[in-house]
A protein has these predicted regions:
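Conserved anion/nucleotide-ligand pocket segment
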Residues: 164-198
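Residues that mark the start of a beta-strand
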Residues: 6-8, 136, 167
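Predominant activation on well-ordered alpha-helical scaffold segments within soluble catalytic domains
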Residues: 26, 30, 148, 178-182
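Glycine-rich nucleotide phosphate-binding loop and flanking beta-alpha elements
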Residues: 87-89, 123-125, 133, 145
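Acidic/polar active-site rim loop that often engages polyanionic ligands
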Residues: 124-131, 163, 177-178
Length: 209
């Protein structure tokens, strides 16, 4: 029986990225891999940290270095993860954001092959790239109006921890990225593995709707 291919998870980071938006989900995936290896199974997730620039200052001032460039092609199956940025509105009028949006517009999402995961106002970035048109999505409550304004064809859902619409998975923000990744681990691996990861991270397996 052929081995299940690993899922490549691409965290696309801009300057000012909210650290908890990506660090929490990344840790969930790391712990999932660790648990699988402890059971004698292969790791399931390969994490990539990509950016228009090789160095980026995060929301808390920590500097990320050695970021990989935005790839011309993605190993599949793959998830592209977009996260929120510091500030009340998402600034896309800068070279880094324009480069990321250009790259995002070239993605061809397909369930089980190339999927989008947004945390917090990462959904607004996705909307600027046209990836949420005709889709239902959520975002941080402070960005719900902005999301609706950026793409009037996106069905914006309030009061949701996370939701899924085809190949698009979105979450409300900050710690809810962990909730969403636990759900994705449960879907792609097993509910038991998701429960082990939640226990290791000392978080609830599922909060709210």
């Amino acid at each position: 029986m052929p081995e299940t291919p690993p899922i490549h998870v691409y965290f696309a980071l801009l300057p000012g990225s909210l650290v908890l938006d990506w660090a929490g989900p990344a840790e969930a995936l790391r712990i999932a891999n660790q648990a699988l290896l402890a059971q004698g199974q292969p790791a399931r997730f390969v994490q990539h940290f990509i950016s228009p620039t090789p160095q980026s200052v995060t929301s808390v001032g920590a500097i990320l270095t050695g970021l990989a460039p935005l790839p011309a092609t993605l190993a599949q199956p793959a998830w592209v993860v977009l996260v929120g940025l510091a500030g009340q509105r998402i600034d896309v009028d800068n070279p880094e954001a324009r480069a990321l949006l250009h790259w995002l517009r070239g993605l061809r999402l397909a369930a089980g092959q190339l999927e989008l995961v947004t945390v917090c106002a990462g959904a607004v970035l996705a909307a600027h790239a046209g990836l949420l048109s005709g889709r239902r999505a959520t975002t941080h409550h402070l960005h719900l109006g902005e999301l609706a304004q950026v793409d009037p064809h996106c069905d914006v859902a309030a009061n949701r921890v996370f939701l899924a619409d085809g190949p698009v998975y979105s979450s409300a923000g900050v710690t809810t990225g962990i909730d969403l990744l636990l759900h994705r681990i449960s879907e792609t691996c097993s509910p038991a593995l998701a429960a082990r990861v939640a226990q290791a991270m000392v978080v609830a397996l599922r909060r709210g709707p």
